[in-house]
C-alpha cells in the first residue's frame, strides 16, 4: 500500500492549504474561519514521482470533546493512528499555545513518527519563530508558508526521508503473472454483483442499499488459465455525502486500490448515465495513470430508445477518453462477461508493453517527417530523440530544443500517432518533454586577441568621426 501521511493540528493553522499544495488540488476548503474542515479528506501526492504517498487532511482539534468539535477531534486521532507519518502543524505567527501543548501530549502517547511543521512564517523572523517552538524538542522541523508555496520542497524532502517504501497494512499481490483489477464506481452500480458473478459464488455482500461494501476486498480468480486478483471497492460518494468515519476510511481504501491495480474497471449504471460522481472517480483513475475499461451495467433492461440515448450521452461525456473500451454488461444475468475480460486483457497488454528505444525513435522520426511542429512566433521546436520512460502507463521521454513552445495540439498529435502505430488501447499514454542544458547559456563568448585588436581599431575609427 502507499504510505499515509496525516496533517494534524489545532484549527486554522493551515493544514488544508498544505494539503492542497501537496496534492496540487483545491479539494480541501480553505478559509480564515476556524473549523472549516471537519471530516478526513484523502488525496494523493505525486510531487515526487519516485515515491507517491497518500495525504489525509483532518479537522482542527479544538480541545472540546463534546458535539461536532469532539467528533472532529476523534476523526483527527483516527487519521493519526492510521498514518505512517504525522505532520504536526502549528502557526508561526501566533506562536505556541496551550492547545498545541495538549495535541503534542497525545501525539507522544500515540508514538507515531512525527515532524513539526511551522506554517505561516511569511512576514516573521524565522529564527525567532523556530526558537519559540524549540521547547517541543523536535529534531525534525520544517518552517514554511503554504499559502505562498514557500518551503514545500523542503517538506517533501523531509517526508521522503521518513516514509517507508510501503505503507502499513496488507500489501496487494504484486505477482507479475497475476492481473490486478479494481472495480470502482458509485454506490449501488453493481460492483459486488459483478465480482460475485465472475467468482461464481456470493463472496461479496450485494444489496440494493448503497454503501454495502465498506472496505476494499481482494479475491483471487483463475479463468481460462490466467490468474487475476479482483478488488471490489466501496462506492465513492460526493464529498458532502461522506459523513461516517468508516466511509472516510472506505474512500481512502478505494484510492489505494486504484493506485495499486493494473486495470481499473469503471462501472456505470445504464439507467442513470454519467454523473458528476462518475467523473470524479474517472479523474482519480486518470491521475493514477491506470489502464481503463468502462463497464456499463444493467444494459439488458434498457429499450432500444434508452440504449440510443445512453450511447449518445456516453459519446458526449466520455469522448475525451475514447481510447478506453466500453463494454455493455449485465452483472446480474452474466451477459457481456467474455467481452469484459477481452477488453481487460487488451488494456493490460497495452499498459504493460515494453518498448525498445529503436522502435520508439523510428516512430518519432516518421511522426516528425509526416507532420513537423509549427512555427510559434518564429520559433520551431526540434524533436531529437525519444526513449521509453516506463510502463503502466506507457511513458515516452522526448528530448529536443525549444520544447516549451511546442503546442498542446502537437503533443496530442504525437499521442494519437503512437497509439495508432503501436495499437495501444485502454491505457493513458504520457509524454515527458526535456530540453538539453545549454552549457553556454548566460555566459559571454570571450574574444580572441585578434578580435580584441579589431574591435579597438573600429572604436578608434568611430571616435575619430
Curated annotation (Swiss-Prot):
<dbReference type="GO" id="GO:0043022">
    <property type="term" value="F:ribosome binding"/>
</dbReference>
<dbReference type="InterPro" id="IPR006073">
    <property type="entry name" value="GTP-bd"/>
</dbReference>
<feature type="binding site">
    <location>
        <begin position="57"/>
        <end position="61"/>
    </location>
    <ligand>
        <name>GTP 1</name>
    </ligand>
</feature>
<comment type="subunit">
    <text>Associates with the 50S ribosomal subunit.</text>
</comment>
<feature type="binding site">
    <location>
        <begin position="232"/>
        <end position="236"/>
    </location>
    <ligand>
        <name>GTP 2</name>
    </ligand>
</feature>
<feature type="domain" description="KH-like">
    <location>
        <begin position="353"/>
        <end position="437"/>
    </location>
</feature>
<dbReference type="InterPro" id="IPR016484">
    <property type="entry name" value="GTPase_Der"/>
</dbReference>
<feature type="domain" description="EngA-type G 1">
    <location>
        <begin position="3"/>
        <end position="167"/>
    </location>
</feature>
<dbReference type="InterPro" id="IPR031166">
    <property type="entry name" value="G_ENGA"/>
</dbReference>
<dbReference type="InterPro" id="IPR005225">
    <property type="entry name" value="Small_GTP-bd"/>
</dbReference>
<keyword id="KW-0690">Ribosome biogenesis</keyword>
<protein>
    <recommendedName>
        <fullName>GTPase Der</fullName>
    </recommendedName>
</protein>
<dbReference type="GO" id="GO:0005525">
    <property type="term" value="F:GTP binding"/>
</dbReference>
<dbReference type="GO" id="GO:0042254">
    <property type="term" value="P:ribosome biogenesis"/>
</dbReference>
<dbReference type="GO" id="GO:0016887">
    <property type="term" value="F:ATP hydrolysis activity"/>
</dbReference>
<keyword id="KW-0342">GTP-binding</keyword>
<dbReference type="InterPro" id="IPR015946">
    <property type="entry name" value="KH_dom-like_a/b"/>
</dbReference>
<dbReference type="Pfam" id="PF14714">
    <property type="entry name" value="KH_dom-like"/>
</dbReference>
<feature type="binding site">
    <location>
        <begin position="9"/>
        <end position="16"/>
    </location>
    <ligand>
        <name>GTP 1</name>
    </ligand>
</feature>
<feature type="binding site">
    <location>
        <begin position="297"/>
        <end position="300"/>
    </location>
    <ligand>
        <name>GTP 2</name>
    </ligand>
</feature>
<dbReference type="InterPro" id="IPR032859">
    <property type="entry name" value="KH_dom-like"/>
</dbReference>
<comment type="function">
    <text>GTPase that plays an essential role in the late steps of ribosome biogenesis.</text>
</comment>
<dbReference type="InterPro" id="IPR003593">
    <property type="entry name" value="AAA+_ATPase"/>
</dbReference>
<dbReference type="Pfam" id="PF01926">
    <property type="entry name" value="MMR_HSR1"/>
</dbReference>
<comment type="similarity">
    <text>Belongs to the TRAFAC class TrmE-Era-EngA-EngB-Septin-like GTPase superfamily. EngA (Der) GTPase family.</text>
</comment>
<dbReference type="InterPro" id="IPR027417">
    <property type="entry name" value="P-loop_NTPase"/>
</dbReference>
<keyword id="KW-0677">Repeat</keyword>
<feature type="binding site">
    <location>
        <begin position="185"/>
        <end position="192"/>
    </location>
    <ligand>
        <name>GTP 2</name>
    </ligand>
</feature>
<feature type="domain" description="EngA-type G 2">
    <location>
        <begin position="179"/>
        <end position="352"/>
    </location>
</feature>
<feature type="binding site">
    <location>
        <begin position="119"/>
        <end position="122"/>
    </location>
    <ligand>
        <name>GTP 1</name>
    </ligand>
</feature>
<keyword id="KW-0547">Nucleotide-binding</keyword>
Amino acid at each position: 500500500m502507499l504510505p499515509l501521511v496525516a496533517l494534524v493540528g489545532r484549527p486554522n493553522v493551515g493544514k488544508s492549504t498544505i494539503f492542497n499544495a501537496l496534492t496540487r488540488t483545491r479539494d480541501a476548503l480553505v478559509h480564515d474561519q476556524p473549523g472549516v474542515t471537519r471530516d478526513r479528506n484523502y488525496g494523493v501526492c505525486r510531487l515526487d514521482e519516485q515515491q507517491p504517498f497518500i495525504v489525509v487532511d483532518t479537522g482542527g482539534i479544538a480541545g472540546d470533546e463534546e458535539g461536532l468539535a469532539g467528533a472532529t477531534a476523534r476523526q483527527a486521532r483516527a487519521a493519526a493512528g492510521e498514518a505512517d507519518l504525522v505532520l504536526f502543524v502549528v502557526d508561526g505567527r501566533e506562536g505556541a499555545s496551550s492547545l498545541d501543548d495538549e495535541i503534542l501530549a497525545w501525539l507522544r502517547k500515540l508514538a507515531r513518527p512525527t515532524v513539526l511543521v511551522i506554517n505561516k512564517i511569511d512576514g516573521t523572523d524565522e529564527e525567532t519563530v523556530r526558537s519559540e517552538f524549540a521547547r517541543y524538542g523536535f529534531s525534525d522541523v520544517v518552517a514554511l508558508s503554504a499559502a505562498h508555496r514557500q518551503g514545500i520542497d523542503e517538506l517533501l524532502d523531509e517526508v521522503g526521508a521518513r516514509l517507508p517504501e510501503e505503507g502499513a497494512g496488507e500489501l496487494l499481490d504484486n505477482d507479475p503473472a497475476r492481473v490486478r483489477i479494481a472495480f470502482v464506481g458509485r454506490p449501488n452500480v453493481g460492483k459486488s454483483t459483478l465480482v460475485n458473478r465472475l467468482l461464481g459464488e456470493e463472496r461479496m455482500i450485494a444489496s440494493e442499499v448503497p454503501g454495502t461494501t465498506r472496505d476494499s476486498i481482494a479475491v483471487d480468480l483463475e479463468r481460462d488459465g490466467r490468474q487475476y486478483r479482483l478488488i471490489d471497492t466501496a462506492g465513492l460518494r460526493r464529498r458532502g455525502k461522506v459523513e461516517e468515519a468508516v466511509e472516510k476510511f472506505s474512500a481512502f481504501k478505494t484510492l489505494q486500490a486504484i493506485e495499486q491495480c493494473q486495470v481499473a474497471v469503471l462501472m456505470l449504471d445504464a439507467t442513470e448515465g454519467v454523473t458528476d460522481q462518475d467523473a470524479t472517480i474517472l479523474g482519480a483513475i486518470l491521475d493514477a495513470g491506470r489502464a481503463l475499461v468502462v463497464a456499463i451495467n444493467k444494459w439488458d433492461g434498457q429499450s432500444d430508445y434508452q440504449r440510443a440515448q445512453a450511447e449518445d450521452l456516453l459519446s458526449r461525456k466520455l469522448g475525451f477518453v475514447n481510447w478506453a473500451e466500453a463494454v455493455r454488461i449485465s452483472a446480474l444475468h452474466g451477459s457481456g462477461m467474455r467481452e469484459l475480460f477481452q477488453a481487460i486483457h487488451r488494456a493490460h497488454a497495452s499498459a504493460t508493453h515494453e518498448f525498445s528505444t529503436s522502435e520508439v525513435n523510428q516512430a518519432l522520426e516518421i511522426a516528425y517527417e509526416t507532420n513537423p511542429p509549427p512555427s510559434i512566433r518564429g520559433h520551431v521546436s526540434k524533436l531529437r530523440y525519444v526513449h521509453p520512460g516506463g510502463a503502466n502507463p506507457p511513458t515516452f521521454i522526448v528530448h529536443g530544443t525549444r520544447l516549451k513552445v511546442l503546442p498542446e495540439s502537437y503533443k496530442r498529435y504525437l499521442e494519437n500517432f503512437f497509439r495508432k502505430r503501436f495499437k495501444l488501447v485502454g491505457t493513458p499514454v504520457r509524454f515527458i518533454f526535456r530540453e538539453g542544458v545549454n552549457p553556454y547559456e548566460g555566459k559571454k563568448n570571450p574574444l580572441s586577441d585578434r578580435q580584441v585588436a579589431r574591435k579597438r581599431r573600429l572604436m578608434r575609427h568611430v571616435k575619430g568621426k
